């Protein structure tokens, strides 16, 4: 809500808008237990058509480059060397996707499907929720909880998301004119995501810059290629670089209502406490690769571990009095004052 009524009830804080959260209250004296669960198989709704043929990709790249600059490039995106001899060899090759040139460096002539290397075809998710409620005329309670888990979309050793949340709500009538309500909730989330050798760059950007189909993921001797390290496939498949995100939220609200004069004068008060804790652990490792059988190299320059912690506490209270005098059937008046 963001209008005059929210400002009237919530004062200065109401000017920034008020979010009203309504949760279920147990009805009647029946004790109820309810379970709900599901299992899902998920896949991407939109999958781009990728050019995975190295020669076709190179032809299109050359056409674009020549139309822009009027001459042939000396490299493709500054890491992949280009010359006419390599281009003619790319046309000739089909079965053997790499060779060692006179300088002892690998040259690649691949048709790599980077989309399949980076993304899973489908992922699985499941959720389970439980609700217990009951009570009597003077006291009612509701306890609910939910667990949700989903695998990530990356073709990685560890890529997943887990969430736990719960709520306990109690309503009690201490006297006919005095009611108390407590609402406690929490949410705990954990996300484990793979990282490349440098977590400052998105996988999609690295893929666009270095993941062209002529590149290979591994060399003939099984070592990683420079492209596999740059794009992040090496990090995903070895699980040596990752980011672990944790977030916990807890909210406690206690409210009291006093009917000083039934249907005429009512006093309400509430107190809310909110606590949030966030943690992030990021680990980035050095990856070895080979530019040739006898040309080992690595990225990045060093291993790193970054840990961040955030804590937030928030408290708010409200007290307001509502006067609704009886003015007959044709007239009404409502006066509200609060702090």
Task: Put a short name on every predicted segment.
Residues 137-143, 291:
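Short coil-to-beta-strand
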Residues 120-122, 132-135:
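Outer-membrane beta-barrel initiation region
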Residues 113-115:
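N-terminal entry motif of extracellular EGF-like repeats
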């Amino acid at each position: 809500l963001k209008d005059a009524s929210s400002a009237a009830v919530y004062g200065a804080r109401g000017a920034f808008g008020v979010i009203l959260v309504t949760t279920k209250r147990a009805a009647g004296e029946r004790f109820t237990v309810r379970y709900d669960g599901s299992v899902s198989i998920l896949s991407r709704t939109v999958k781009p058509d990728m050019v995975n043929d190295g020669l076709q990709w190179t032809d299109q790249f050359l056409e674009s480059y020549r139309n822009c600059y009027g001459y042939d490039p000396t490299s493709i995106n500054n890491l992949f060397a280009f010359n006419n001899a390599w281009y003619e060899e790319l046309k000739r090759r089909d079965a053997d996707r790499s060779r060692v040139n006179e300088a002892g460096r690998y040259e690649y002539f691949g048709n790599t499907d980077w989309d399949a290397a980076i993304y899973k075809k489908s992922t699985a998710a499941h959720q389970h929720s439980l609700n217990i409620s009951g009570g009597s005329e003077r006291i009612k309670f509701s306890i609910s909880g939910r667990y949700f888990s989903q695998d990530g979309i990356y073709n990685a050793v560890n890529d997943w998301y887990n969430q736990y949340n719960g709520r306990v709500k109690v309503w009690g009538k201490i006297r006919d004119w005095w009611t108390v309500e407590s609402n406690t909730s929490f949410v705990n989330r954990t996300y484990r995501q793979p990282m490349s050798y440098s977590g400052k760059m998105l996988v999609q950007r690295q893929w666009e810059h270095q993941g062209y189909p002529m590149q290979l993921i591994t060399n003939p001797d099984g070592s990683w290629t420079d492209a596999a390290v740059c794009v992040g496939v090496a990090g995903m498949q070895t699980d040596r670089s990752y980011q672990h995100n944790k977030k916990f939220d807890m909210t406690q609200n206690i409210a009291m209502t006093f009917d000083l004069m039934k249907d005429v004068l009512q006093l309400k008060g509430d107190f809310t406490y909110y606590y949030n804790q966030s943690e992030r652990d990021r680990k980035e490792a050095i990856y070895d690769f080979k530019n040739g059988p006898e040309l080992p190299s690595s990225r990045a320059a060093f291993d790193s571990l970054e840990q961040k912690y955030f804590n937030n506490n928030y408290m708010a209270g409200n007290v307001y009095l509502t006067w609704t005098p009886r003015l007959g059937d044709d007239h009404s008046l409502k006066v509200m004052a609060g702090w």
